């Protein structure tokens, strides 16, 4: 009798994706983050589902309902903080995953990479709309500022913004539709993630050396299942440490003040994982220019495959490109810091220089260093 694992129509799919999947024998812990994001997504959907059972998407009761969840619902506080900090863990894994893709040349799997960029945009949209739901000061003003950016679009901008708001300002209609979208998007993300895996399994995984590993594959289970479980335990330990010891560390104190359209907070800023993009947005003194730079800061990932000049896929044996990569990481950390600072000297000029450097590294220096390294190999 043949194994049911290999013959059953449904179990066969799982088997070919997680058990008998031929995997390179040398992939490092940097390849853990995909599965960690899968776990984050499941965790977010589950905690979000339980929060939605008690949350009300009405401007008069939204803030109170979140307070009610934390005070009166059994274990509501832990569900709420796991959901809020789970988003942060999700983005940490996301940034590591994208960084890994850039370092090891995974972007040459074009379909997988482009679906990944689409996933990144969708996750960012979901997180933004989720941040609006508690209806605190930063929720309200964050929603106002970010949706207002669309008014920079020539001719249709103002109409578009009012259409998204469902009125002439961020109000009840906006909150209700954001809740609806925030609920549906994670399921769209799940579908995109399945497509992401589908295209990845067409080619097989990349590996740190960047050369074909077809001659040296091992089954995913038990080798990488156990390795993924280790990564999972580390991530859950970090998440629960954050949730149980300092749940508000990454939040904004202003969000504990109910939304008030008549009182603007002194510093409007998004959650930490958007600060790098926010800094790029603010570094351009023109509204439309800033919005374009904001979109390009992520869309620039889409042209990285076209800018790959090196004869080698991975950066493992390319010291010049490695230096540029880590400079890019440092630059992103600088942008994240600047995004949380007030708009005054010297932060303005630091933000502008960091923004220029960000685009310069990806669009100019990386391709040049790849070409230089090709020449160096001839010596």
Swiss-Prot record:
Signal sequence annotation: none
GO molecular function terms attached to this record: metal ion binding; ubiquinol-cytochrome-c reductase activity
Residues given in the record as a ubiquinone binding sites: 201
Entry-linked Pfam families: Cytochrom_B_C (PF00032), Cytochrome_B (PF00033)
Keyword DNA repair: no
GO aspect biological process, one term: mitochondrial electron transport, ubiquinol to cytochrome c
Cell compartment(s), UniProt: Mitochondrion inner membrane
Spans through the membrane: 33-53, 77-98, 113-133, 178-198, 226-246, 288-308, 320-340, 347-367
Membrane topology classification: Multi-pass membrane protein
Primary location class: mitochondrion
Entry binding sites for heme b b562: 83, 182
SUPFAM superfamilies: a domain/subunit of cytochrome bc1 complex (Ubiquinol-cytochrome c reductase), Transmembrane di-heme cytochromes
Binding locations of heme b b566: 97, 196
GO CC field: mitochondrial inner membrane; respiratory chain complex III
Keywords of the record: Electron transport, Heme, Iron, Membrane, Metal-binding, Mitochondrion, Mitochondrion inner membrane, Respiratory chain, Transmembrane, Transmembrane helix, Transport, Ubiquinone
Cofactor(s) required, per the database record: heme b
Role description: Component of the ubiquinol-cytochrome c reductase complex (complex III or cytochrome b-c1 complex) that is part of the mitochondrial respiratory chain. The b-c1 complex mediates electron transfer from ubiquinol to cytochrome c. Contributes to the generation of a proton gradient across the mitochondrial membrane that is then used for ATP synthesis.
Family per record: Belongs to the cytochrome b family.
Known partners and oligomeric status: The cytochrome bc1 complex contains 11 subunits: 3 respiratory subunits (MT-CYB, CYC1 and UQCRFS1), 2 core proteins (UQCRC1 and UQCRC2) and 6 low-molecular weight proteins (UQCRH/QCR6, UQCRB/QCR7, UQCRQ/QCR8, UQCR10/QCR9, UQCR11/QCR10 and a cleavage product of UQCRFS1). This cytochrome bc1 complex then forms a dimer.
Miscellaneous comment as given in the Swiss-Prot or TrEMBL entry: Heme 1 (or BL or b562) is low-potential and absorbs at about 562 nm, and heme 2 (or BH or b566) is high-potential and absorbs at about 566 nm.
Listed name of the protein: Cytochrome b
Organism, as annotated: Crossarchus obscurus
Organism phylogeny: Eukaryota, Metazoa, Chordata, Craniata, Vertebrata
The encoding gene: MT-CYB
